[in-house]
């Protein structure tokens, strides 16, 4: 009997890439591939790449350099593929810069991987970065029950891809294409199958997830709020999340879902990028800081216990000290539970790359450090406010010490507990007893029997 071929997939960047990597693995499982955690042991290595920042793209070439050396040292015939947004943006240039690469495949062509690999085995080098007319989701197989169980009680489900916003700093519209939404029936079908296989929490993902406008079973276009309501009716699906959102698409129906659906977790990632109206206009965000504050006020009125996270870019071309102070002010006023902050990175082909007033790395680094201080203080305050609170925790994986398990709070915080009799995929009610820099610790009070709800007791609003 022939031994199975081994597959190693490494994901860079966003949750969409994690999801896509899983779907590629599912497709290749049908071709006899089994996953390995060791690239040196693999017959096929896939790097699923991110192009959002220059540093992310350069990581890929560093990884390819390591793979080239390892392949030469071992004398192996490992097939090396580059997928994702770097593949889409750079295409055949990747093979010129890294001749070790056998296959370059863009995000819309993953369902064609088996036929591409057959061509590689015939000695060809393959580049496929087209936007095919067929929907890749119609052709990618669902994960097996064994694969779902191995991935744990949480899962991602893509509901839309692409972006029509054309922020001046961003490559996503060029690498992922226009906004396209899946049909409600396909999303619900995928979610039901995951729940039947033991998944208890689903995160809906998309480049601009709250721009979702899929066809409903009634033939009408449904927004994300109505989709969430439909998914909340799946028996056994205890938690729902979604990411990443744009303020322009935060409509009243979606805000009402936060008010009405206990399964929808009280934690929202809503990138703002800057607190300066002038910079927001230059970024083509098409909203100002006051609109952002209004959205936050509506969300907190609808769901008083909601917590927020965000993304920030510092050092955008032309950003003055006054612009940056506006960003610090917004961060302090909102009080984010968590946030990601980055220095502006020139992305070739975007309008901002042609801007005359690029800032020095020294200025960008200094501003990033100042913003990080504010955001870290806000996160610490939020975490400390959790002391003594009672949360329902979904147990996801073993801890480092015997008997320990690690779960997630409604706010995505890691929570370390000792829970005799409980296992991965179970919910336990926990009193938070300690706050660390990267996780919380808690004392188990009891098991949660009603897994169709997030909590059997209301959470208290927190101020960071």
From Swiss-Prot:
Q: Where are the transmembrane segments?
A: none
Q: What is its EC number?
A: 2.8.4.3
Binding positions for [4Fe-4S] cluster 1 per the UniProt entry: 14, 50, 85
Keyword line: 4Fe-4S, Cytoplasm, Iron, Iron-sulfur, Metal-binding, S-adenosyl-L-methionine, Transferase, tRNA processing
PROSITE patterns in the cross-refs: MTTASE_N, MTTASE_RADICAL, RADICAL_SAM, TRAM
| SMART domains in alphabetical order | Elp3 (SM00729)
Task: Outline the extent of the MTTase N-terminal domain.
Answer: 5-122
Give the enzyme class: transferase
Q: Which InterPro entries match?
A: Elp3/MiaA/NifB-like_rSAM, Methylthiotransferase, Methylthiotransferase_CS, Methylthiotransferase_N, Methylthiotransferase_N_sf, MiaB_methiolase, rSAM, rSAM_horseshoe
Has UniProt tagged this entry with the keyword 4Fe-4S?
A: yes
What domain of life is recorded for the organism? Bacteria
Please give the chief subcellular localization of this protein.
Answer: cytoplasm
> Where is it localised?
Cytoplasm
Name all TRAM domain ranges. Answer: 384-446
Which residues bind [4Fe-4S] cluster 2 per the record?
Answer: 163, 167, 170
Per the record, GO CC terms?
A: cytosol
User: Which cofactors are required for activity?
Assistant: [4Fe-4S] cluster
MF terms (GO), sorted A to Z? 4 iron, 4 sulfur cluster binding; metal ion binding; N6-isopentenyladenosine methylthiotransferase activity
Q: How is the cofactor bound?
A: Binds 2 [4Fe-4S] clusters. One cluster is coordinated with 3 cysteines and an exchangeable S-adenosyl-L-methionine.
Q: Which reaction does it catalyse?
A: N(6)-dimethylallyladenosine(37) in tRNA + (sulfur carrier)-SH + AH2 + 2 S-adenosyl-L-methionine = 2-methylsulfanyl-N(6)-dimethylallyladenosine(37) in tRNA + (sulfur carrier)-H + 5'-deoxyadenosine + L-methionine + A + S-adenosyl-L-homocysteine + 2 H(+)
Function text: Catalyzes the methylthiolation of N6-(dimethylallyl)adenosine (i(6)A), leading to the formation of 2-methylthio-N6-(dimethylallyl)adenosine (ms(2)i(6)A) at position 37 in tRNAs that read codons beginning with uridine.
Subunit architecture: Monomer.
Indicate the family of this protein: Belongs to the methylthiotransferase family. MiaB subfamily.
Question: What's the protein here called?
Answer: tRNA-2-methylthio-N(6)-dimethylallyladenosine synthase
Q: Which organism is it from?
A: Azorhizobium caulinodans (strain ATCC 43989 / DSM 5975 / JCM 20966 / LMG 6465 / NBRC 14845 / NCIMB 13405 / ORS 571)
Q: What is the lineage of its organism?
A: Bacteria, Pseudomonadati, Pseudomonadota, Alphaproteobacteria, Hyphomicrobiales
Gene this chain is encoded by: miaB
